[in-house]
Amino acid sequence: MAATNIYLNFQGNAAEAFNLYKSVFNTEFSAPIMRMGDMPAQEGMPQLSDAEKKMVMHVALPILGGTQIMGTDMLESMGHKLIVGNNTTISLELDSKEEADRIYNALAQGGTDCVAPHDEFWGYWGVCLDRFGIRWMFNVLNSRNA
């Protein structure tokens, strides 16, 4: 079955971020976290340091309604440079203001550029850049907000 997943890149703290997300959404990883050190050596691939071997190669976590967020740590030694920006947003359409507030409050701790959920003309809305540089948007549409 086809699916759309959200893929997030981190700079050495993917495991920490995904453990927070796991607790926020009260769910379990789809499979054990795969570490860079689990990757078989490939021709032309640079030797990984012990610290790099512990970084996340791949992690997947189901969140709401079958959506999965996935992630990795980007390694500069392999030619990947992370640039944190606002080009990735995870938009959550939630069923209640209480659920929006609970998730917002957990993700806003240590975050920046946060607008607490509040009533807008279309529903209840908020946004926050969490402490890992991931932007989250919270929506409870008026039709769900009875």
Regions found by a protein language model. Name each.
Residues 8-66:
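Core segments of cupin and vicinal oxygen chelate
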Residues 2, 31-35, 60-63, 69-82, ...:
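Vicinal oxygen chelate
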